[in-house]
Amino acid sequence: MENIQLKKQIKSMDKVLFIVRGLPGSGKSTLAKSLGSVHFEADMYFMEGNEYKFDITKIKKSHEWCQNQVEISMKNGNIGDSRIAVSNTFTQEWEMKPYVDLAEKYGYTVFTIIVENRHGGVNVHNVPEETLNAMLNRFETKLI
């Protein structure tokens, strides 16, 4: 019953930003696509047609691109539906700050969602196990 009430409350909100966090393969992208009318993630920067071409030297640029896309969407009022979802690993709190700042600037309510891999999701980007473990070890949660 509480989930239904929360859904109704969120749907009635004018401007919402969903920040979807989790390790690679957890299902962030799938969830984010279902939440917002617009969805962004840094991985989109590496898409060439239908092919994903990751380049570690461009990681900073990919995150700048993602933040810029979110801001453009917020500025434009997201053309009729102001629900935006951004999904990245966001393993540390400071990585979300630029998005929280944008939300404050443009009057968006922020919901942060942590996606766990309880469904046995596959790591589609072939991130090595040791990298996943390092990401898990630095994953920060700040509960009030």
Feature-to-residue mapping (PLM):
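Walker A (P-loop) ATP-phosphate-binding motif of ABC ATPase nucleotide-binding domains
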Residues: L17
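Short beta-strand-centered segment that lines the nucleotide-binding/catalytic pocket of NTP-utilizing
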Residues: V38-E51
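Conserved glycine(s) of the Walker
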Residues: G27
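The conserved Walker
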Residues: P24
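Pre-Walker A adenine-sensing motif
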Residues: E2-S12
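Hydrophobic positions on the alpha1 helix immediately C-terminal to the Walker A/P-loop
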Residues: L31
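Hydrophobic anchor at the beta1->P-loop junction of P-loop NTPases
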Residues: V20
